């Protein structure tokens, strides 16, 4: 049985892993004919507020990845860099979210060998589950139309006040990009119940193993989502549990 390990780390703590992430992500973009993405740069690799999750196969090495970039107001989020010239309204929208703790889920990719197996959704779930560890209340993302379903599963909703109802032609004419937000990453009330349970499980037990079916193949999935392997603040867990019980009671 194949083993997939989902490993989270601060970007500055593992330069070699970041370099491999960049290499594989660019290869996937080139396969789609995309070479001019403004946000496909190396700036994030030296940002202490960028967190990375990679999917590592015991058979095939790094097969997917995703990032969470926390908005401290010192460096533009990728979504700002991508959309500001298309619609200046992205700036005040992000400023309003930053006050309570906001970050961007970005840089999602998976190798072609793992296409249509559900890996993007698994990476997105893992990324969203990090919210409590890194002090976020909201998360934003910019997704291509063909990955919209993964964002919706994770609880993202469309930022309809910018662009054409949240939609932009970016980065090439054949791709529609959608700006999205999870307004409350702690409660995750915008996520479908089945997927919300999964993300809450990863949040409450960030170090776990489970058998999941990718395509039709059972796969051993090992989650290593504790940043720095530190002891997590149990007060955050208590808050998550209370909100979970409240949500169940009112569902």
Outline where the language-model segments fall.
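Terminal substrate-recognition subdomain of acyl/acetyltransferases
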Residues: 1-35, 43-46, 108, 112, ...
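Conserved acetyl-CoA-binding loop-helix of GNAT-fold acetyltransferases
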Residues: 115-129
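A structural signal for short, well-ordered beta-strand segments and their strand-loop junctions
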Residues: 62-65, 104, 138-142
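A short helix-loop-beta-strand connector motif used in the catalytic cores of GNAT acetyltransferases and
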Residues: 44-54, 73-77
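Active-site beta-strand termini and strand-to-loop segments that position acidic
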Residues: 55-58, 182
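Conserved acyl-donor/pantetheine-binding loop and adjacent beta-alpha core of acyl/acetyltransferases
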Residues: 67-111, 171
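Conserved beta-strand in the GNAT
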Residues: 54, 61-70
């Amino acid at each position: 049985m194949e083993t997939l390990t989902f490993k989270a780390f601060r970007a500055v703590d593992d330069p070699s892993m970041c370099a491999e992430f960049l290499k594989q992500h660019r290869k996937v973009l080139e396969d789609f004919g995309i070479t001019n993405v403004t946000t496909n740069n190396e700036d994030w690799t030296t940002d202490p507020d960028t967190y990375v999750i990679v999917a590592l196969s015991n058979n095939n090495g790094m097969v997917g990845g995703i990032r969470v970039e926390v908005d401290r107001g010192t460096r533009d989020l990728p979504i700002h860099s991508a959309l500001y010239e298309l619609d200046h309204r992205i700036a005040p929208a992000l400023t309003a979210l930053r006050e309570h703790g906001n970050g961007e889920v970005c840089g999602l990719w998976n190798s072609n060998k793992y296409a249509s197996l559900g890996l993007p959704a698994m990476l997105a779930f893992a990324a969203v589950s990090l919210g409590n560890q890194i002090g976020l209340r909201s998360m934003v993302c910019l997704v291509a139309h063909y990955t919209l379903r993964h964002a919706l599963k994770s609880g993202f909703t469309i930022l309809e006040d910018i662009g054409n109802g949240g939609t932009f032609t970016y980065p090439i004419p054949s791709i529609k990009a959608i700006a999205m937000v999870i307004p409350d990453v702690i409660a995750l009330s915008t996520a479908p119940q089945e997927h919300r349970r999964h993300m809450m499980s990863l949040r409450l037990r960030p170090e776990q193993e489970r058998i999941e079916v990718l395509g039709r193949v059972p796969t051993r999935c090992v989650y290593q989502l504790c940043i720095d392997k530190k002891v997590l603040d149990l007060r955050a867990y208590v808050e998550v549990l209370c909100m979970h019980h409240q949500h169940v009671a009112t569902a």
